[in-house]
């Protein structure tokens, strides 16, 4: 059973409810950005918690690179959120992988904690009023040619952009932990 604090936090982020705003520095060193600026003049936004060293995140580099072309009416915020993943590691990944999407750095995982993120990648769809419409995986970690492939986030985006309610508003996550876990034997 979750602690009462965990239950309080979970209840503060219901689907359809408001998500907390944030302001983080981009890895590039430019001016701070937050949810409000990502949503500016957009119908909504996708926020993806991401890690430079997570192999699951690496798989979605191309998806994130093409996102703005595929969904020009939506903002995109990619948040580097992994314990002890410093700006140097993020900058190296950007250069080595020729990443063109901006990455915001959640240095102390404050935004990840506020948004209940414990693994990367984790995607959120938010409308222009900062209401949470979808949270979960980008897909079911199968490749598009697999008959069982399910592009969860794309389906949510299609529903939202066509003016329909998002049919599947939450999916289970998978990926790399944002924080180290140590097991101690006594």
Spell out what each predicted region is:
Residues 18, 43, 118-120:
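Short, small/polar residue-rich loop motifs at catalytic or cofactor-binding pockets
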Residues 2-37:
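N-terminal "domain-start" segment that seeds a small globular fold
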Residues 17, 30-31, 110, 131, ...:
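Residue-level signal for well-ordered, solvent-exposed loop/turn and beta-edge residues enriched
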Residues 58-97, 107-114:
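Structural microenvironment flanking redox-active thiols in thiol-disulfide oxidoreductases
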Residues 51-61, 83-84, 123, 174-183:
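Short, thiol/selenol-centered motifs that function as redox-active sites or metal-ligating centers
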Residues 35-59, 64, 157:
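Short active-site neighborhood of thiol/selenol oxidoreductases, capturing the structured segment around
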Residues 93-127, 132-133:
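Short, internal strand/loop/helix patches
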Residues 127-128, 132-186:
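Thiol-/selenol-based redox modules, centered on thioredoxin-like
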């Amino acid at each position: 059973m979750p602690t009462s604090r965990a239950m309080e936090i979970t209840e503060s982020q219901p689907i359809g409810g408001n998500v907390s705003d944030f302001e983080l520095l981009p890895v590039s060193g430019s001016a701070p950005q937050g949810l409000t600026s990502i949503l500016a003049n957009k119908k909504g936004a996708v926020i993806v918690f991401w890690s430079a060293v997570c192999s699951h995140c690496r798989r979605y580099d191309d998806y994130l690179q093409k996102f703005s072309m595929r969904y020009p009416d939506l903002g995109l915020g990619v948040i580097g959120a992994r314990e002890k993943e410093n700006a140097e590691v993020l900058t190296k990944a950007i250069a080595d992988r020729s990443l063109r999407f901006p990455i915001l750095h959640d240095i102390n995982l404050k935004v990840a904690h506020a948004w209940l993120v414990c693994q990367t990648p984790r995607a959120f769809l938010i409308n222009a009023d900062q209401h949470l419409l979808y949270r979960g995986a980008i897909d079911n970690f199968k490749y598009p040619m697999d008959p069982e492939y399910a592009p969860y986030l794309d389906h949510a985006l299609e529903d939202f952009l066509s003016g329909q309610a998002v049919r599947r508003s939450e999916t289970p996550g998978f990926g790399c932990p944002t924080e180290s876990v140590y097991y101690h034997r006594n």
